[in-house]
Amino acid sequence: DYGVTADGIVGPETARLLGINLNDQASNDLYLIAKCVYAEARGEPYVGKVAVAAVILNRVEHPDFPNTVYGVVYQPWAFTAVFDGQINLEPDETAYQAAQDALNGWDPTYGCIYYYNPETATSEWIFSREVVVTIGKHNFAI
C-alpha cells in the first residue's frame, strides 16, 4: 500500500514510513535494541523478545554496566549475537515492537540484568545467578 515490500525487515524506507527517524539517538537506541532482540530471541515468544530488550535497558540503568544502549550491547562478551555476527542482521517488525514495548516500560523480567539459555550456556558463572523468571528457552536472572 505504501510502496514497501513486505519482507519482514525494517529498512530505512520502511522506518521512514513508520515514523522512525534513524538519525536521532532515541531511534538509534530503538534500532540497536531491535537488532539485538532479533539476533538473540528470534525463536522466542513475544514476551521473551520484550524481556531481552528489558535486560538491555536494565543494564543501562545498573551501575555495573555501561550507561548507554550501545555500550551495553557492545560490551565485550555480553551478547552472543555480537560475538557471532548475528547482530548485523536486520530486525523484523516484531523485534521493533518488542524493543518499543520495553522502552515504554514493560519489563517482564522484573528488573533482571542477565539471561541465558540453560541448554546452550557454556559459562559456569551464569548458572550462579539467581533465576527470577523463565520465559521461553531463557532464564532471566539477577
Give residue ranges: language-model regions.
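Intrinsically disordered, low-complexity Ser/Thr-rich linker and spacer segments
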Residues: 12-30
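Short acidic, glycine/serine/threonine-rich helix-capping segments at coil-helix boundaries
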Residues: 1-16
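Bacterial extracytoplasmic/cell-wall-associated proteins, especially those involved in peptidoglycan
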Residues: 25-142
